[in-house]
Protein backbone atom coordinates (compact mmCIF):
# COMPACT_ATOMS: atom_id res chain seq x y z
CA UNK A 1 0.00 0.00 0.00
CA UNK A 2 1.36 3.43 -0.95
CA UNK A 3 1.66 6.34 1.47
CA UNK A 4 -1.28 8.04 -0.24
CA UNK A 5 -3.47 5.00 0.33
CA UNK A 6 -2.31 4.72 3.92
CA UNK A 7 -3.11 8.41 4.47
CA UNK A 8 -6.57 8.02 2.94
CA UNK A 9 -7.19 4.89 4.99
CA UNK A 10 -6.13 6.68 8.14
CA UNK A 11 -8.55 9.52 7.44
CA UNK A 12 -11.28 6.99 6.75
CA UNK A 13 -10.69 5.32 10.08
CA UNK A 14 -10.93 8.65 11.90
CA UNK A 15 -14.19 9.53 10.18
CA UNK A 16 -15.64 6.04 10.40
CA UNK A 17 -15.78 3.43 13.08
CA UNK A 18 -12.00 3.00 13.52
CA UNK A 19 -11.91 5.20 16.60
CA UNK A 20 -14.56 3.02 18.24
CA UNK A 21 -12.50 -0.14 17.86
CA UNK A 22 -9.42 1.68 19.16
CA UNK A 23 -11.38 2.92 22.17
CA UNK A 24 -12.66 -0.59 22.88
CA UNK A 25 -9.16 -2.02 22.57
CA UNK A 26 -7.80 0.69 24.88
CA UNK A 27 -10.48 -0.16 27.44
CA UNK A 28 -9.59 -3.87 27.31
CA UNK A 29 -5.87 -3.20 27.63
CA UNK A 30 -6.39 -0.70 30.46
CA UNK A 31 -8.57 -3.11 32.43
CA UNK A 32 -5.85 -5.75 32.09
CA UNK A 33 -3.33 -3.35 33.64
CA UNK A 34 -4.15 -2.47 37.23
CA UNK A 35 -2.28 0.80 37.71
CA UNK A 36 -3.87 2.76 34.83
CA UNK A 37 -7.32 1.71 36.08
CA UNK A 38 -6.52 2.96 39.57
CA UNK A 39 -5.13 6.20 38.12
CA UNK A 40 -8.24 6.82 36.02
CA UNK A 41 -10.48 5.95 38.98
CA UNK A 42 -8.75 8.49 41.20
CA UNK A 43 -8.84 11.17 38.49
CA UNK A 44 -12.57 10.55 38.01
CA UNK A 45 -13.03 10.89 41.76
CA UNK A 46 -11.06 14.17 41.70
CA UNK A 47 -13.11 15.40 38.74
CA UNK A 48 -16.36 14.62 40.55
CA UNK A 49 -15.07 16.46 43.61
CA UNK A 50 -14.14 19.43 41.42
CA UNK A 51 -17.47 19.58 39.59
CA UNK A 52 -19.80 18.78 42.49
CA UNK A 53 -17.71 20.18 45.34
CA UNK A 54 -20.31 22.83 46.07
CA UNK A 55 -22.92 20.14 46.80
CA UNK A 56 -20.56 17.65 48.47
CA UNK A 57 -18.86 20.09 50.84
CA UNK A 58 -20.52 20.05 54.29
CA UNK A 59 -19.47 23.65 55.04
CA UNK A 60 -18.66 26.88 53.27
CA UNK A 61 -14.89 26.62 52.65
CA UNK A 62 -14.36 30.19 53.87
CA UNK A 63 -16.65 30.01 56.89
CA UNK A 64 -14.58 30.76 60.01
CA UNK A 65 -15.19 29.46 63.52
CA UNK A 66 -12.43 30.55 65.87
CA UNK A 67 -13.95 28.57 68.73
CA UNK A 68 -13.22 25.36 66.79
CA UNK A 69 -9.87 26.38 65.27
CA UNK A 70 -7.35 23.56 64.75
CA UNK A 71 -9.98 20.96 65.62
CA UNK A 72 -8.94 17.33 65.20
CA UNK A 73 -10.43 15.18 62.41
CA UNK A 74 -13.95 13.86 63.12
CA UNK A 75 -14.67 16.72 65.53
CA UNK A 76 -18.30 17.85 65.75
CA UNK A 77 -18.77 21.16 63.99
CA UNK A 78 -21.50 23.81 63.95
CA UNK A 79 -25.07 23.07 62.88
CA UNK A 80 -24.67 19.38 63.66
CA UNK A 81 -21.95 18.87 61.06
CA UNK A 82 -18.62 17.11 61.44
CA UNK A 83 -15.13 18.29 60.54
CA UNK A 84 -14.21 15.06 58.75
CA UNK A 85 -10.58 16.11 58.21
CA UNK A 86 -10.36 18.65 61.01
CA UNK A 87 -10.25 22.44 60.80
CA UNK A 88 -7.49 24.94 60.10
CA UNK A 89 -6.12 27.88 62.11
CA UNK A 90 -9.22 29.95 61.30
CA UNK A 91 -11.70 27.19 62.07
CA UNK A 92 -12.47 26.44 58.41
CA UNK A 93 -13.36 22.89 57.42
CA UNK A 94 -10.36 21.18 55.77
CA UNK A 95 -12.52 18.67 53.86
CA UNK A 96 -14.63 21.42 52.27
CA UNK A 97 -11.54 23.38 51.31
CA UNK A 98 -9.99 20.23 49.85
CA UNK A 99 -13.02 19.73 47.59
CA UNK A 100 -13.01 23.34 46.42
CA UNK A 101 -9.23 23.17 45.99
CA UNK A 102 -9.66 20.27 43.56
CA UNK A 103 -11.80 22.52 41.37
CA UNK A 104 -9.16 25.24 41.20
CA UNK A 105 -6.16 22.93 40.78
CA UNK A 106 -7.71 20.80 38.03
CA UNK A 107 -9.19 23.81 36.24
CA UNK A 108 -5.84 25.57 36.23
CA UNK A 109 -4.10 22.38 35.08
CA UNK A 110 -6.36 21.66 32.11
CA UNK A 111 -6.86 25.30 31.11
CA UNK A 112 -3.13 26.03 31.18
CA UNK A 113 -2.42 22.97 29.02
CA UNK A 114 -5.14 24.12 26.60
CA UNK A 115 -3.55 27.58 26.34
CA UNK A 116 0.00 26.26 26.05
CA UNK A 117 -0.97 23.46 23.68
CA UNK A 118 -2.92 25.77 21.36
CA UNK A 119 -0.05 28.25 21.14
CA UNK A 120 2.63 25.57 20.84
CA UNK A 121 0.84 23.39 18.29
CA UNK A 122 0.02 26.37 16.08
CA UNK A 123 3.57 27.71 16.32
CA UNK A 124 5.06 24.28 15.63
CA UNK A 125 2.85 23.67 12.59
CA UNK A 126 3.67 27.05 11.06
CA UNK A 127 7.35 26.72 11.88
CA UNK A 128 7.70 23.23 10.43
CA UNK A 129 5.56 23.79 7.35
CA UNK A 130 6.85 27.17 6.18
CA UNK A 131 10.41 27.06 7.54
CA UNK A 132 12.70 29.99 6.72
CA UNK A 133 12.69 33.13 8.83
CA UNK A 134 9.43 32.19 10.56
CA UNK A 135 10.97 28.93 11.73
CA UNK A 136 14.07 30.74 13.00
CA UNK A 137 11.99 33.36 14.82
CA UNK A 138 9.74 30.86 16.60
CA UNK A 139 12.59 28.56 17.60
CA UNK A 140 14.75 31.44 18.88
CA UNK A 141 11.85 32.73 20.98
CA UNK A 142 11.56 29.27 22.46
CA UNK A 143 15.31 29.15 23.15
CA UNK A 144 15.16 32.51 24.92
CA UNK A 145 12.30 31.36 27.13
CA UNK A 146 14.06 28.09 28.01
CA UNK A 147 17.18 30.03 29.01
CA UNK A 148 15.34 31.28 32.10
CA UNK A 149 14.09 29.06 34.95
CA UNK A 150 10.34 28.81 34.50
CA UNK A 151 9.48 29.40 38.15
CA UNK A 152 11.46 32.66 38.02
CA UNK A 153 9.59 33.82 34.91
CA UNK A 154 6.27 32.87 36.50
CA UNK A 155 7.06 34.86 39.64
CA UNK A 156 8.07 37.89 37.54
CA UNK A 157 4.88 37.80 35.46
CA UNK A 158 2.59 37.25 38.45
CA UNK A 159 4.20 40.10 40.37
CA UNK A 160 3.45 42.38 37.40
CA UNK A 161 0.01 40.99 36.49
CA UNK A 162 -1.18 40.31 40.01
CA UNK A 163 -2.78 37.22 41.48
CA UNK A 164 -5.84 35.65 39.91
CA UNK A 165 -6.95 32.37 38.39
CA UNK A 166 -6.82 33.60 34.79
CA UNK A 167 -3.46 35.29 35.22
CA UNK A 168 -2.14 32.04 36.67
CA UNK A 169 -3.57 30.05 33.76
CA UNK A 170 -2.00 32.38 31.19
CA UNK A 171 1.41 32.33 32.87
CA UNK A 172 1.46 28.55 33.29
CA UNK A 173 0.17 28.06 29.73
CA UNK A 174 2.87 30.27 28.24
CA UNK A 175 5.40 28.21 30.15
CA UNK A 176 4.33 25.04 28.29
CA UNK A 177 4.15 26.14 24.65
CA UNK A 178 7.80 25.51 23.75
CA UNK A 179 7.53 21.77 24.40
CA UNK A 180 4.58 21.40 22.04
CA UNK A 181 6.11 23.68 19.41
CA UNK A 182 9.35 21.69 19.17
CA UNK A 183 7.66 18.30 18.94
CA UNK A 184 5.06 19.47 16.42
CA UNK A 185 7.74 21.21 14.34
CA UNK A 186 9.83 18.02 14.14
CA UNK A 187 6.82 15.92 13.11
CA UNK A 188 5.65 18.53 10.59
CA UNK A 189 9.09 18.62 8.96
CA UNK A 190 8.92 14.86 8.45
CA UNK A 191 5.35 14.89 7.12
CA UNK A 192 5.21 17.94 4.86
CA UNK A 193 6.92 16.13 1.95
CA UNK A 194 5.02 12.85 2.31
CA UNK A 195 2.95 11.57 -0.58
CA UNK A 196 -0.44 12.09 1.06
CA UNK A 197 0.46 15.75 1.73
CA UNK A 198 1.62 16.16 -1.86
CA UNK A 199 -1.65 14.59 -2.98
CA UNK A 200 -3.59 17.14 -0.93
CA UNK A 201 -1.64 19.95 -2.62
CA UNK A 202 -2.28 18.42 -6.04
CA UNK A 203 -6.01 18.32 -5.33
CA UNK A 204 -5.96 22.06 -4.63
CA UNK A 205 -6.40 22.02 -0.86
CA UNK A 206 -5.61 25.33 0.79
CA UNK A 207 -2.55 25.76 2.99
CA UNK A 208 -4.80 26.03 6.04
CA UNK A 209 -6.52 22.75 5.14
CA UNK A 210 -3.22 20.96 4.56
CA UNK A 211 -1.76 22.11 7.87
CA UNK A 212 -4.76 21.62 10.13
CA UNK A 213 -6.73 18.86 8.40
CA UNK A 214 -4.02 16.74 6.79
CA UNK A 215 -0.89 17.11 8.93
CA UNK A 216 -2.30 17.85 12.40
CA UNK A 217 -4.40 14.65 12.79
CA UNK A 218 -1.28 12.59 12.12
CA UNK A 219 0.69 14.09 15.02
CA UNK A 220 -1.95 14.11 17.75
CA UNK A 221 -0.97 10.80 19.39
CA UNK A 222 2.33 11.95 20.96
CA UNK A 223 0.72 15.25 21.97
CA UNK A 224 -1.88 13.36 24.01
CA UNK A 225 0.90 11.67 25.97
CA UNK A 226 2.76 14.94 26.54
CA UNK A 227 -0.43 16.69 27.67
CA UNK A 228 -1.09 14.08 30.36
CA UNK A 229 2.41 14.54 31.77
CA UNK A 230 2.19 18.32 31.50
CA UNK A 231 -1.08 18.51 33.43
CA UNK A 232 0.76 16.95 36.36
CA UNK A 233 3.63 19.42 35.94
CA UNK A 234 1.26 22.40 35.83
CA UNK A 235 -0.59 21.24 38.96
CA UNK A 236 2.75 21.06 40.78
CA UNK A 237 3.69 24.53 39.52
CA UNK A 238 0.33 25.94 40.64
CA UNK A 239 0.81 24.39 44.06
CA UNK A 240 4.33 25.83 44.30
CA UNK A 241 3.21 29.33 43.29
CA UNK A 242 0.23 29.20 45.66
CA UNK A 243 2.58 28.03 48.41
CA UNK A 244 4.66 31.16 47.75
CA UNK A 245 1.54 33.34 47.86
CA UNK A 246 1.66 34.15 44.14
CA UNK A 247 -1.19 32.02 42.88
CA UNK A 248 -4.87 32.72 43.23
CA UNK A 249 -6.26 35.25 45.76
CA UNK A 250 -6.07 34.18 49.42
CA UNK A 251 -9.84 33.73 49.74
CA UNK A 252 -9.82 31.05 47.01
CA UNK A 253 -8.89 27.64 48.47
CA UNK A 254 -6.25 25.65 46.59
CA UNK A 255 -4.15 22.69 47.61
CA UNK A 256 -0.98 24.76 47.41
CA UNK A 257 -2.35 27.56 49.56
CA UNK A 258 -3.56 24.99 52.11
CA UNK A 259 -0.01 23.68 52.35
CA UNK A 260 1.29 27.22 52.79
CA UNK A 261 -1.18 27.87 55.61
CA UNK A 262 -0.04 24.71 57.41
CA UNK A 263 3.55 25.90 57.86
CA UNK A 264 2.95 27.66 61.16
CA UNK A 265 0.97 24.81 62.70
CA UNK A 266 3.20 21.83 61.91
CA UNK A 267 5.25 22.48 65.04
CA UNK A 268 2.01 22.20 67.04
CA UNK A 269 1.54 18.65 65.68
CA UNK A 270 -1.48 19.64 63.57
CA UNK A 271 -0.46 17.14 60.92
CA UNK A 272 -3.76 17.02 59.00
CA UNK A 273 -3.36 20.55 57.67
CA UNK A 274 -0.36 19.49 55.56
CA UNK A 275 -0.97 15.78 55.06
CA UNK A 276 -4.37 15.88 53.33
CA UNK A 277 -3.62 18.55 50.68
CA UNK A 278 -0.14 17.07 50.22
CA UNK A 279 -1.56 13.61 49.61
CA UNK A 280 -4.15 15.07 47.19
CA UNK A 281 -1.39 16.74 45.15
CA UNK A 282 0.78 13.61 45.24
CA UNK A 283 -1.99 11.24 44.12
CA UNK A 284 -3.19 13.58 41.36
CA UNK A 285 0.30 14.06 39.93
CA UNK A 286 1.07 10.35 40.26
CA UNK A 287 -2.19 9.41 38.51
CA UNK A 288 -1.50 11.70 35.56
CA UNK A 289 2.04 10.33 35.28
CA UNK A 290 0.82 6.72 35.34
CA UNK A 291 -1.82 7.55 32.73
CA UNK A 292 0.74 9.31 30.55
CA UNK A 293 3.15 6.38 30.80
CA UNK A 294 0.40 3.97 29.80
CA UNK A 295 -0.72 6.16 26.89
CA UNK A 296 2.87 6.34 25.63
CA UNK A 297 3.12 2.55 25.54
CA UNK A 298 -0.35 2.10 24.08
CA UNK A 299 0.05 4.63 21.26
CA UNK A 300 3.59 3.59 20.28
CA UNK A 301 3.46 0.50 18.00
CA UNK A 302 6.95 -0.50 19.13
CA UNK A 303 5.83 -0.63 22.77
CA UNK A 304 2.26 -1.76 22.27
CA UNK A 305 3.02 -5.41 23.01
CA UNK A 306 4.11 -4.43 26.52
CA UNK A 307 0.74 -2.91 27.45
Residue positions per predicted region:
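Transmembrane alpha-helical segments of polytopic membrane transport and secretion proteins
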Residues: 1-41, 290-307
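Alpha-helical transmembrane segments of integral membrane proteins
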Residues: 34-44, 90-307
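Phosphate/oxyanion-binding loops and surfaces in catalytic or ligand/nucleic-acid-binding neighborhoods
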Residues: 47, 51-58, 73, 222, ...
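Short, membrane-interfacial amphipathic segments enriched in basic
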Residues: 7-26, 80-95, 127, 208-212, ...
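Short, strongly hydrophobic transmembrane alpha-helices
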Residues: 37-54, 113, 121
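Hydrophobic alpha-helical transmembrane segments of membrane transport/permease proteins
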Residues: 2-4, 41, 49-87, 244-253
Amino acid sequence: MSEIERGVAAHGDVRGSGWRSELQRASRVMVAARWPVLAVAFLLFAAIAAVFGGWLAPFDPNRQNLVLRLADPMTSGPDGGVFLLGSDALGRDVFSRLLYGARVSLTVGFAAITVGGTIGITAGLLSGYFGGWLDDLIMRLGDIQLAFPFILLAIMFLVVLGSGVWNLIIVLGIGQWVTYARIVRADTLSLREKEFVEAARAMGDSTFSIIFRTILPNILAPLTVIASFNVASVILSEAALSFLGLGVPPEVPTWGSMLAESRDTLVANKWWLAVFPGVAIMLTVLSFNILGDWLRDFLDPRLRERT
